[in-house]
Design a protein with these regions (language model features):
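A conserved ligand/cofactor-binding region detector
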Residues: 1-817
Length: 817
């Protein structure tokens, strides 16, 4: 291999240079000229021209990382919801306007190209978007690191709304290719499944396995206004045997490719339906596939500059984004003790210094577990390692706790009640040097409730790092009108230091600024109204209050509470049409998991309510209900900047943090919410007078439950609520199928109302009256909106990553000089 430095053209980014680069890439990269090029070809050529400018930074960053022998962060996540890359890269490089001019000079509309780029379908919701924000901030701060995940061929699904119901279609986002990625066919690792184990002296050999190849695909993650970059490395499954030639020659063409198809299914689809045994097994195979390849890859990278594992923990930090990647722990142990023959105690000691784990849920039923039988069949060696870790852990705790048998059962990594299951979150805690929650309340409840025993055993391990979002995408990119206004007033440095937004507080009494702020918001509302009129055929007044609840459809997020208020408001308007109502457009967006029947029923209820409300001539423009289909990053960039009101109404104690609340507040939406997750910290940051708080607190929820909560009593005592629920029960919104929503009624009224929808309804309705009153005074509303933007400094993912780097990973920024 040559060590000679390559000579290459240093690309500048003038309009002429960009135009020439696009032309070259069209000719030599796409293989077309201007006569035959189609719009997607122009997008591909422009993307390659931008990618070329990132690569030199990428190479420099990689070389400096090796020269400085830095500690690297390996961020493992099943999801990376990165959205579109083109605009983000232009803003990071500072070449948005030059690129627009360059394309215009070639007769191409850049805005049309931007709309053609598909979202990378590598995630579903907040978990994946958080991971993407973190990669952006790591690169911007110069934190050396890699994101690792799976290169799904299909996303979770493309959501269509047909007759008010969710219909799932394949999301083949790679149909036109992906110009941003670099296939690395030379970087492949064997990933094993099944087989059996054999003791070979002082180590164990795993034999008779089936295997699949994991091939790397790399994408450059640019930092903003810096030459530092990082890498997102995604694994794609490749069959170790492409074709059974003997079967093919016999004419058995299907059998000839069966093994290849089965192998490559591992990276085919994000979150296969796990309501069947086959779906659950595929999910487990996915999780192990990506962590096995990742652990092999980080060992290879470490060994390039180190001959022993003595400094392994000094140079490697592995972060687990939720429990999906927890199998990385036994896999790294297996590689160290069985392949590299590191003694158990030394290997385990290194692992406990390297790993950290972020918990994202307070609901015990959402903590991932795997049954012992399946693990024994698919990953027999890993189960042995988990059993040994558990035995040593329980022995240590038993000696310290005076042999408390009940506690030992509670904290065992293996749940022995009923079907034996391995508790993945517990394994992560035992192996990690730090475990963090993602908001102050979440971290408190995590150590008080679901992990209370572990918090007593390892008090020093538990900490809080409140989530954050990247302001580059969620304000600079998503809302050009508002970000341009802010630039005019305080400059552009807020993109790197979000606390700069505090200076906007000085302008809340400046009439010219308040008017300009309101106009920027109005432009965003017009943009969204135009989009929805085209895509949903629903038109509405852009001067109405835009009321948004955009998030995964789940009972704990309480879209039902919002729907009930919509129905009550609808009934009130019909009863009093002459009253001066504040016009309101209530928008929902989000996907329901394909196997989650209740969530899909909630979507159908929203659809049926929308159909009734939007076609009632007595209602007119005073109330509209819209479900925006296929919610993802690009849809969010369109819808979030237009919001007036942000619905963050989960039952207190259920939402770990939330990041949609931060994105909406950053764009000047006022929050209506419970004291849950990061809402509490947003309330502190923007002032109680600039947010609408309602409902039971987490402690009050516990007290109400302990006292014997009776939702039917609430139903009977509130006439407006009772009428709305009866309309749901009797088919008022579903005359074609009157019993369609009977389960919703019974869940809320007769089956315990687990998420306290009815308990919080009266307080929610009162808070909505406050919303109406504030919105009637545009000046007061806009001043509160300005306060929300100004208070968002602490919710930048740059702050979050800075805390991770200092407190958890113990890693320093790369010296780019």
């Amino acid at each position: 291999m040559t060590a000679v430095d390559l000579e290459f053209d240093q690309l500048n980014s003038t309009v002429d240079a960009l135009r020439r680069s696009i032309s070259n890439r069209m000719m030599y990269g796409v293989g077309k000229d201007a006569v035959t090029a189609r719009p997607h070809d122009w997008l591909h050529a422009a993307a390659l021209a931008v990618r070329d400018r990132l690569v030199a930074r990428w190479m420099k960053t990689t070389r400096l990382q090796y020269e400085q022998d830095v500690k690297r962060v390996y961020y493992l996540s099943m999801e990376f919801l990165i959205g579109r890359t083109f605009t983000n890269a232009l803003l990071a490089l500072g070449i948005y306007e030059p690129m627009r001019e360059a394309l215009a000079g070639l007769g191409v509309d850049m805005e049309a190209l931007i709309e053609m780029e598909p979202d990378a379908a590598l995630g579903n919701g907040g978990l994946g978007r958080l991971a993407a924000c973190f990669l952006d901030s790591m690169a911007t701060l110069g934190i050396p690191g890699f994101g690792y995940g799976i290169r799904y061929e299909y996303g979770m699904f493309r959501q269509q709304i047909v007759n008010g119901e969710q219909v799932e279609a394949p999301d083949y986002w790679l149909r036109a290719g992906n110009p941003w990625e670099f296939p690395r066919s030379e970087i492949q690792y064997l990933v094993h499944f099944g087989g059996r184990t054999v003791q070979r002296g002082d180590y164990v050999e795993w034999i008779d396995t089936q295997h699949v190849n994991a091939m790397a695909y790399d994408t450059v993650i640019p930092g903003y206004a810096t030459s530092a970059t990082n890498t997102l490395r995604l694994w794609s499954a490749r069959a170790s045997e492409e074709l059974d030639l003997s079967a093919f020659n016999r004419g058995d063409y299907r059998s000839a490719v069966d093994a290849k198809t089965m192998s490559e299914n591992v990276s085919r689809l994000l979150y296969p339906d796990d309501s069947t045994p086959a779906g659950r097994e595929l999910r487990l195979r996915q999780e192990y596939f990506f962590v096995s390849a990742t652990m092999q890859d980080l060992i290879r990278r470490y060994q390039r500059t180190h001959s022993t594992f003595g400094r392994f923990a000094e140079k490697v930090a592995v972060h687990l984004n939720d429990t999906h990647p927890v199998l990385a722990i036994p896999e790294l142990m297996r590689l160290l003790i069985d392949v590299h023959h590191v003694p158990w105690d030394k290997a385990w000691g290194q692992i406990q210094q390297m790993f950290s784990y972020t918990n994202h849920t307070l609901m015990p039923e959402a903590l991932e577990t795997w049954d012992v039988e399946t693990l024994a069949r698919l990953l027999p060696r890993h189960l042995e390692i988990i059993f040994e870790i558990n035995a040593q852990f329980l022995k240590h705790v038993s000696e310290q706790s005076g042999h408390d048998a009940e506690m030992i059962r509670r904290i065992s990594l293996v749940d022995e009640y009923g079907q034996r299951r391995v508790r993945m979150a517990y394994l992560a805690i035992v192996a990690s040097q730090k475990v963090n929650g993602v908001s102050k309340l979440h971290s408190q409840l995590m150590t008080r409730d679901i992990f209370a025993d572990f918090a007593r055993i390892y008090p020093e391990r538990f900490t809080n790092v409140t989530n954050g979002i990247t302001p580059r995408r969620w304000l600079a990119q998503a809302s050009p009108s508002l970000s341009s206004l802010i630039d005019e007033q305080i400059g552009t440095h807020w993109r790197r230091d979000l606390f700069e937004l505090e200076r906007l507080r000085e302008l809340r009494n400046d009439s010219a600024f308040v008017d300009a702020f309101r106009e920027a918001k109005r432009q965003n509302k017009l943009r969204l109204a135009h989009h929805l009129a085209h895509h949903t055929k629903i038109s509405f007044d852009p001067n109405a209050l835009f009321d948004l609840q955009v998030k995964r459809i789940h009972e704990y997020k309480r879209q039902l509470l919002n729907v009930l208020h919509v129905i009550v408001r609808y009934n009130q308007i019909r009863a009093n049409p002459e009253r001066d109502w504040v016009p309101r457009v209530v928008m929902f967006a989000g996907k329901a998991a394909s196997a989650y029947r209740m969530a899909k029923t909630i979507i159908k209820l929203i659809g049926d309510v929308s159909e009734k409300v939007n076609h009632d001539p007595l209602i007119g423009d005073r109330l509209k209900v819209v479900f925006v289909p296929n919610y993802g990053v690009s849809v969010a960039e369109l819808i979030i900047p237009a919001a007036d009101l942000s619905e963050q109404i989960s039952m207190a104690g259920t939402e770990a943090s939330g990041t949609g609340n931060m994105k909406l507040a950053l764009n000047g939406a006022l929050t209506i919410g419970t004291m849950d997750g990061a809402n509490i910290e947003i309330c502190d940051a923007v002032g109680r007078e600039n947010i609408f708080i309602f409902g039971h607190t987490a402690d009050e929820v516990d007290s109400l439950r302990a006292a014997g909560y009776r939702p039917r009593q609430v139903y009977e005592e509130n006439p407006e609520l009772r009428m709305a629920l009866d309309q749901i029960r009797t088919g008022f919104f579903s005359p074609d199928d009157p019993l369609r929503f009977s389960d919703i009624f019974h869940t809320l009224v007769d089956w315990g109302d687990h998420y306290m929808v009815l308990a919080d309804f009266a307080a929610f309705a009162e808070a909505q009256k406050e919303v109406d009153e504030r919105f009637r005074t545009p000046r007061a509303w806009t001043e509160s909106a300005i306060e929300n933007v100004a208070g968002m400094g602490q919710f930048s993912s740059d702050r979050t990553i800075g805390e991770y780097a200092r407190e958890i990973w113990h890693v320093k920024s790369l010296d780019m000089s």
